[in-house]
Amino acid sequence: MNHILLVGAGGALGSVLRYLVGLWMLQRAGPAFPWGTLFVNVTGSFLIGFLAEFIMHKMGASPEMRVFLITGVLGGYTTFSAFSLDAIALLEHGQTMSGLAYIVASVGLSMLAVFAGLALMRAMV
């Protein structure tokens, strides 16, 4: 139960941070391109790599800190960072084909799922 509360608290913090960063980017770059989403995905991916290495290998942080920061805060900030970390882990462990398949499947199937959801709702309305 403690971990669930930590994930929830971290997720709330990460979601608010994502919203604020999105607004900040929108004010600076305008609405013509999704700069906020790109910025969040790239910075979230950097942070998950940095924190995973720092927390797990340099700091020896508690499972609670890992759950709060990585699953909670960064999970609320961007799930693209988790996808990126999983893909890199597969590639670093020599599972090149699995890693590439995971990347292609994640992006391709997610795009198809969004398209299917849009099409279904448009057909219902």
UniProtKB/Swiss-Prot annotation:
GO cellular component: a single term: plasma membrane
Organism: Rhizobium meliloti (strain 1021)
Molecular functions per Gene Ontology: fluoride channel activity; metal ion binding
NCBIfam families named among the record's database cross-references: crcB (TIGR00494), PRK14195.1 (NF010791)
Keyword set includes Kinase: no
Transmembrane feature ranges: 4-24, 32-52, 68-88, 100-120
Function: Fluoride-specific ion channel. Important for reducing fluoride concentration in the cell, thus reducing its toxicity.
Keywords: Cell inner membrane, Cell membrane, Ion channel, Ion transport, Membrane, Metal-binding, Sodium, Transmembrane, Transmembrane helix, Transport
UniProt lineage: Bacteria, Pseudomonadati, Pseudomonadota, Alphaproteobacteria, Hyphomicrobiales
Activity regulation remarks: Na(+) is not transported, but it plays an essential structural role and its presence is essential for fluoride channel function.
Catalytic activity: fluoride(in) = fluoride(out)
Membrane topology label: Multi-pass membrane protein
Listed name of the protein: Fluoride-specific ion channel FluC
